[in-house]
Amino acid sequence: MLIIKESDVKKLISLKEVIDINEQVFIKESKEEVVCPERIILPVEKTQPQQDSNEPINKKQLVGNLYFKPSLVVDESVGIKIVGTFANNANKGLPTVPATIILNDIETGLANAVIGATYITGARTAAGSAISVKYLATESPETIFVFGSSLQAQLHIEMILLLKPTIKKVYISSRSKENVDKLIIQLKNENNYNNDAVEFNYCAATGAGDDKDIINRYLLEADIIVTATSSNEPLFNGHEVLSEKQRDFKKKPLLICAVGSSRPTNRELDSFTISNSNLIVDDVNSCMVSGELFIPINKENIITKSHILGKLSDVVSGKYKQQTTTTTSKSITVYKSSGTAIQDVATANYIYKKALQNNIGYNININD
């Protein structure tokens, strides 16, 4: 069994190859050549010490959540990703979303590899969005607006610029200007972007009311909007940004890639935005429990599950044909991603093969 560290994953990965691998796995999904059971969510609790006699004995405190996500890509790979959400890890200098993938041999079932998968998770999510950009965005986009300044935001920018060299402006909005400044330096240093070719800008502070008008102005300019945050509330007002008085969507179509939320209480997009868009998802079951869909379907009753027009696998296979929405004349598409294990396993298998080719990783015989 091969142990592959996070640092080795970063050395081995090629963003273009990851996009190609993920596009192929969505094509296989369209041919029903994958198996992807629903994820299992396990709340991780610990017993709190009793502070006084009035408190209940054995009171439980939620530490975090673990998600178990198995999948099979027929004739290629099988495995499981275990990913957690542990907010207090930030205080310990650890990833708040730790992830590990176990790959098994498709002939014997034995474990082939254990792979640090935090970077893989970011890369496969960004690859899904990049694929949606390839098929659903305007042909020659010039401007991206990105909410967030994390690894997820970085990988989205890198992959989208890789596929769409026509892009000239990138606006990045985050609560921390310092984090955005660091991200911009990193983007320029790691990708050798010519300062004259791509203009990177910090745009206001997400969540700051005084900056709303500035954010809205640049959102109206954007051809692609990416939301990659942990926000509990919508990041912008759809009534203001998606107004036909402000923008001719037939002449300037809009693609929104929403990847940050996965729980019913969290959402980055409001119900107006969702209900007035052509909605594509990566995985129906996972997205149905994200706030973007759960709230307008189950709490507000303004749309139904049928508002989902297709999956990304339908897009890449040609089963889904892009259209203007039936509710308005706008040409607005939302690609909602909550993550699918077929991407995790396919991307991990790609890393495993490259590690073998490059003699990277630590071999351990656990069956000895």
From Swiss-Prot:
For this UniProt record, the keywords arranged alphabetically read as follows: Lyase
User: SUPFAM superfamilies annotated for this entry?
Assistant: NAD(P)-binding Rossmann-fold domains
A molecular function annotated in GO for this UniProt entry is: lyase activity
Q: What would be one Pfam family of this protein?
A: OCD_Mu_crystall
**Which family, according to UniProt?**
Belongs to the ornithine cyclodeaminase/mu-crystallin family.
Q: Which GO terms describe its cellular component?
A: cytoplasm
Q: Does the keyword Lyase apply?
A: yes
Q: Which Gene3D superfamilies match?
A: NAD(P)-binding Rossmann-like Domain, ornithine cyclodeaminase, domain 1
Lyase listed as a keyword: yes
Enzyme Commission numbers on file? 4.3.1.-
- This protein is called what? Uncharacterized cyclodeaminase
